[in-house]
Amino acid sequence: MSKQKIRIRLKAFDHTILDQSAEKIVETAKSTGAKVVGPVPLPTEKDVITILRAVHKYKDSREQFEVRTHKRLIDIVNPSPKTVDALMRLNLPAGVDIEIKL
């Protein structure tokens, strides 16, 4: 598995859980001897939803809600089989979406 890299993208609504998960992945990869690049913060997606407060009229009275999706990118360069096994056994919180590309 030399001269390869593993690219890990993390997504979450809560940035504190996301940063803790990224730190767990980085220290797990470093403990197995792989070189780690990141975590690199990617742009935050902000979805804004506007609804009317009243049911029938008063269009000037609106309320806005937003959902922010925070993202991080981690590259693991020259991973060993030991690194891949350690990453597969890693327990991360339920609010974090993980996308791994080899």
Swiss-Prot record:
**GO biological process annotations for this chain's record?**
translation
Q: What Gene Ontology cellular component terms go with this record?
A: ribonucleoprotein complex; ribosome
The keyword Ribosomal protein is assigned to this record: yes
Q: Which domain of life is it from?
A: Bacteria
Any one GO molecular-function label of the UniProt entry? tRNA binding
Q: What does this protein do?
A: Involved in the binding of tRNA to the ribosomes.
Family note = Belongs to the universal ribosomal protein uS10 family.
Give the quaternary structure.
Part of the 30S ribosomal subunit.
Protein name per UniProt: Small ribosomal subunit protein uS10
